[in-house]
Amino acid sequence: MTWQHVEAPTPTQQEANWLLQRPVVERVFGAPDPGNPQGRERYEATFSRGYLAHASISPSCGLALYKDTKLTVWTHCQGVYPLRAALSKILKLDPSSIIVHHVQGSGCYGHNGADDAAADAAIIAMQKPGQPIRVRWRREEEFIYEPKTPAMVVKVRALLDDAGKPVDWTQEIWSPTHNLRPGAGGNLLGALALPDPPPEPPPNDVPEANGGGGTRNGEPLYDIPAKRMLHHLVTESPVRTSALRGLGAMPNVFAMECCIDDLAARAGKDPVEYRLSIMTDPRARGVIEKAAAMAKWQAGAPGGQGRGRGIAFARYKNKAAYSAVVIELSVDEEIRLHHVWCAVDAGLVVNPDGVINQVEGGIIQSASWVLKEQVRFDNGVASFDWETYPVLKFSEVPEIDIELINTKDEIPLGVGEVTAGPTAAAIGNAVSHALGARIRDLPLTRERIMAALLKE
């Protein structure tokens, strides 16, 4: 597979700088920017994250059978109906002649190679009527060819009042699309080999009504009088990009909550106290207070000695479940997580065990993203196995305590992606507490730890 019309970043090109130079589609949300006519104190910071892989434990697989003018497909993809629509388009079959069965497989965590493997099987099956066709990608193929989650750059600008509280907040976001799932026939690798492939879809992202893609959780829930998002939808990428657990929420919350800790330090306030001082939502306050109590949070606890604690909060999409996370860790040459405390308010909890499983899974996966994961490029994708794309090991998983605030009078809220952002930011804040230095680029590698210490 050869990609055309894009300039792939090499190891000497940092993704953040590369993204800032790409063509974009501009979108603006929120209050107009008044500038700074009152000459208020100004805060600015920039954060970045590289491309990530879904890193499913098993490569993608699909099975197809074309018999008696009917196409039957078995797949572990996340959307059987969008896949059917895409197959109908590329194979020029009526949708009523296609049946797509969902079967259990390794977790997708978004849009990985499962749709592509199913499409590969379907395309071959159309040439071999009556013959079942099974396609299973190799590990290398999965890492190289599956859609990646986009690299992102997030810049935060805040104007502060005399008490050090934000009165104006701008979150500026650069990101390729998080929304190239199959549907109208686009974004299936196998379709590119057909005589009449579908046209490339126009640049788009998840609508704000559905939580946004690159802008997801880009607006603070805190009581800030004026808030806005500037979204630069990057229209070029060296690899296909699409959905991964949480979409843009993790880098947006990472940036936002690290900034909140920085503002607390500038104001001479404890991070928990500062958050509560700018938050009136009772359910948000509830999870912040609960997580702090679970961890026996001590205001003013000394840091900078290689061991630290951090806290972070978010309400996923600003309309799903609330969560706050406290993390204790140590930093030597690398970061070691010791304990995670998490409080979640998901409304009426119907299946507590299922909720806890989702919350724990989100914490572990987010920790892996923050500490280890990044797709590397060297004249193409250079991350193709577990050695070149390491993930968190079982031996590196910390002790995790979860407490559900079962607000039985409230409707149930989704929890599958609620802890990705707060976990990432809590790690970032704990590292800052342990080192006395802020690292704003993910993952938090040994090289970045050393660079931050030398800079300080």
Name each region found by the language model.
Residues M1-E456:
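Cofactor-binding beta-sheet edge motifs in enzyme active sites
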